[in-house]
């Protein structure tokens, strides 16, 4: 009996001494590989389009209170110091061209822009320049050019709970190339500069319904326009004005439906002063408060990621 017990103990001892060697011979599972770091440079191309019941630029109709369509193309180069971008966008417009209005009746609005943007945690910054080009303008008696550019800066802060705020500033040294209009009217040649600044706020609801995300947003701004030449040209009031909008948007994949109400503090007379329309055409609705529905499509593709 003792011999049997000793034999069992010896067998267990041999098995125990062999266990580490046996475990060492088992194949070991390799640790999961860490995901590769993002490339230091990456190119994205964003494209999109829009159809809307009216095209408003800071509260003023650009499509004669009628529907408008547009599209854009924007390559973005992501680098270690931020994203550099350039783009082109086009919109169908309809400036009233009857006698005395003073408009040059361009075929479209083409926006050519470029800049740099970056973010640091919740804070974002975007600076750039945009050219507003109006092709095929007609001579209106004093000018055939309304092209102008703006330099801009935008800041934003995301609180991380769906709520975000922002600030924008745009500057142009020659609004709508009015310097040529003033010169054509025999006024001292000068460039009417203008600064537009605004604040924005948005809230994105955390819940989705049928995979549709919802956001409410608004903007309040002021366009500060130099006045001396406007008054010499026959304007009866300061063309500067306050602008605002508030709305709700519903996004599903690449599609967004935006329902928005726009307004300014301009009367028909104030609007005529800003647009420099003839004295016989000062009753207009281009600056009236208005509800606009817009359907947008936005997508992007990465190259070399």
Language-model region placement:
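Cleavable N-terminal export/targeting peptides
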Residues: 1-42, 300-305
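Transmembrane beta-strands of outer-membrane beta-barrel pores
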Residues: 51-57, 90-94, 118, 129-136, ...
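Transmembrane beta-strands of outer-membrane beta-barrel proteins
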Residues: 43-49, 83-88, 112, 125-128, ...
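Outer-membrane beta-barrel "beta-signal"
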Residues: 283-305
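Residues that define the transmembrane beta-barrel architecture of outer-membrane proteins
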Residues: 43, 65-71, 106-110, 123, ...
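Outer-membrane beta-barrel translocator domains and adjoining extracellular loop/strand segments
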Residues: 57-64, 96-110, 137-146, 176-188, ...
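Short loop/turn motifs that connect adjacent beta-strands in outer-membrane beta-barrel proteins
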Residues: 34-44, 78-85, 119-124, 159-165, ...
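Short glycine/proline- and aromatic-enriched beta-strand/turn motifs that initiate or cap beta-hairpins
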Residues: 24-28, 37-83, 87-96
């Amino acid at each position: 009996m003792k011999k049997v017990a000793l034999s069992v103990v010896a067998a267990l001892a041999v098995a125990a001494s062999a266990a580490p060697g046996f475990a060492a011979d088992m194949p070991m599972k390799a640790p999961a590989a860490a995901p590769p770091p993002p490339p230091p440079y990456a190119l994205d191309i964003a494209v999109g389009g829009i159809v809307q019941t009216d095209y408003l630029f800071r509260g003023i109709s650009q499509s004669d209170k009628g529907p408008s369509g547009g599209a854009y193309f924007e390559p973005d180069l992501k680098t270690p110091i931020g994203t550099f971008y350039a783009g082109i966008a086009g919109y169908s417009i309809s400036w009233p061209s009857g006698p005395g209005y003073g408009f040059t009746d361009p075929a479209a609005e083409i926006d050519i822009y470029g800049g740099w943007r970056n973010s640091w945690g919740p804070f974002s910054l975007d600076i750039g320049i945009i050219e507003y080009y109006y092709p095929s303008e007609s001579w209106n008696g004093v000018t055939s050019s309304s092209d102008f550019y703006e330099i801009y800066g935008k800041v934003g802060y995301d609180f991380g709970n769906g709520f975000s705020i922002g600030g924008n500033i745009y500057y142009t040294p020659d609004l709508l190339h009015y310097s040529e209009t003033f010169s054509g009217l025999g006024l001292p040649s000068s460039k009417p500069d203008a600064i537009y600044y605004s604040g924005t706020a948005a809230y994105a609801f955390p819940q989705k319904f049928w995979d549709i995300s919802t956001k409410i947003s608004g903007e309040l701004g002021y366009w500060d326009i130099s006045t001396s030449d406007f008054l010499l040209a026959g304007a009866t009031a300061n063309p500067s004005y306050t602008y605002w909008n508030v709305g709700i948007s519903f996004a599903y994949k690449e599609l967004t439906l935006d329902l928005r109400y726009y307004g300014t503090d301009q009367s028909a007379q104030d609007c005529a002063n800003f647009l420099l329309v003839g004295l016989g055409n000062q009753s207009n609705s281009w600056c009236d408060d208005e509800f606009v529905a817009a359907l947008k499509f936005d997508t992007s593709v990465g190259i070399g990621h």
